[in-house]
């Protein structure tokens, strides 16, 4: 027997990526909206998974740099987001450093770093008066040195049994997995139950 399988071509409209303006940046802090900044995330599936986690945890804003090392929204990232693209606005910026400088004092700029001394569990307490700008770095290199230098706080997700001088069985979590842990810690004090 021969079975014929017909594949239906489906097209997904690319979500509008809005250019970040000073007015939009000010609205993040005025509305006390936590925001995610991606620093050169190269994998479209990771972008989609981060969008899905952001939507799940009520984060409405994600900023991506206009940089060729930063992935944009693809059909793959849209599918991985599983509906999250409808709840999250993606913005683009031509300068990550300008964004970090413009939110100084208005938002808590929190970077992720394998050498950080603060546990991610403190993240909610860091953001009781100002919203967070969570910075997630490239899959291989993390956040850049210039971004790290412009963070108010650096946090680490500790591995099981973490002790000074003890190596992790794996270097780190995937950036999308790390985003989920960070957003959970950020929002855990805001649960309605």
Segments and roles (model prediction):
Residues 76-84, 145-193:
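Structured adenosyl-cofactor binding patch, chiefly the S-adenosyl-L-methionine
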Residues 109-171:
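Active-site/ligand-binding-proximal alpha/beta "capping" segment
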Residues 3-117:
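RNA substrate-binding interface of SAM-dependent RNA methyltransferases
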Residues 100-104, 124-127, 187:
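Surface-exposed amphipathic alpha-helices with a cationic face
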Residues 39, 46, 139, 152, ...:
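Acidic active-site catalytic centers that drive phospho-/nucleotidyl reactions
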